Amino acid sequence: MTRTRLAAVWCSLLIMLSSCASDQLADAPTPAVNPSPTTSPTLPSPSSSARLNKPPAKPQRTSVTVVMNGDLLWHNTLWFGAKEDAQRRGKGGYDFAPLLAGIKPVIASADLAICHEEVPLARLGGPYRNYPVFAAPPHVVKAISATGYDVCTTASNHAVDQGFAGVKRTLDDLDHAKIAHAGTARTKAESERPTIFTTRQGVKIGIVAATFSLNGIPMPEGKPWAVQRMSAKNLLAQAHRARVAGADIVLAAVHVGTEYSTSENAEQVRLARALTASPDVDLVYMHHPHVVQPWTRMNKKWVLYGVGNTVAQQVAPRTYEGVTGRFTFTRVGNGRFTVSKAEYIPTLVTAYRPGRPARLYQVSVALKTAKGSFRGRLLDAQRRTTATVTRKHPHGLMRG
């Protein structure tokens, strides 16, 4: 074999070896720079991560607004005006709705509105009776309902002016108008059954009521339960029954005080202290003096010593001035309801004149358009009511 041929053979062998080596390198796996572990950790999905970082939900807040005011004391001149109002509309009977129309926006907008039906109702057609032994036209109930009241308290010194028949008739008429009531009863069982109003939010509000006096008229024979009489023991027992029945809030309405006095008396103070000391009572308000009295806080709860008259036709100018309380109760989460906003709303009812029926006004609204002597009268009412209600400087009270 020549040297040239031998060289050619070696070259061929080298090329073949090189080709095989290249094929083996090409078939070999490429080593990983960062080899993965045998089991990979599970990473949270974006939605899981969002849940982990989401702040806790705020507790739910529930609020309800309650309004209450004073005596619906149906003097005969109020009937006269209601008869004139009915005649203007071409109707017979009595129309009391125009009398109360001025306060309707406040009453109708509340979650619960409470009136005080001071006197018993007569049967349709009468006889209707004025002071001192009342029997009001039953037409008043239609106006009370149309104004937006949900509940009326009925325990007062005039509750048995027409005997047990008057008690029963009044409650029957309120029932017919779908207005709840507290303070008087037709049966013993009814007297023991708590009055609880359920708001549109599902909040249950109990109303308990009692009166200090029946003007010397005996309780109907054999019916000692017909009217709730005032004592801390009785009111607290009522409040406890309301709590047991599921009430979230309990309001105590008491007919007590010195007539025509703009200051609370010792009896009112003692009663307020006893009631507010109980966890079963959330707010106390009082009527009977026919004039506004101070409001205060006791045991961290609101006490309204006097809300004055809502409608009446008495002599003293102050008896035409009243005040409506508006309280917002709020609960956070599963806690108790407490007052988160407290307001007083001065009112004024005008005197009847033939051809000019009485009218009830929300003072702040009427002042926007009133002129002359009527404006001056409204300003006097606002000043007097504000000075009296705030005399004890209750923290957090606002004028509505």
Predicted regions and their residues:
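Acidic, metal/ion-coordinating pockets
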Residues: 21-400
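N-terminal export and membrane-targeting signals
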Residues: 1-13
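C-terminal motif of bacterial Sec signal peptides marking the signal peptidase cleavage site
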Residues: 16-19
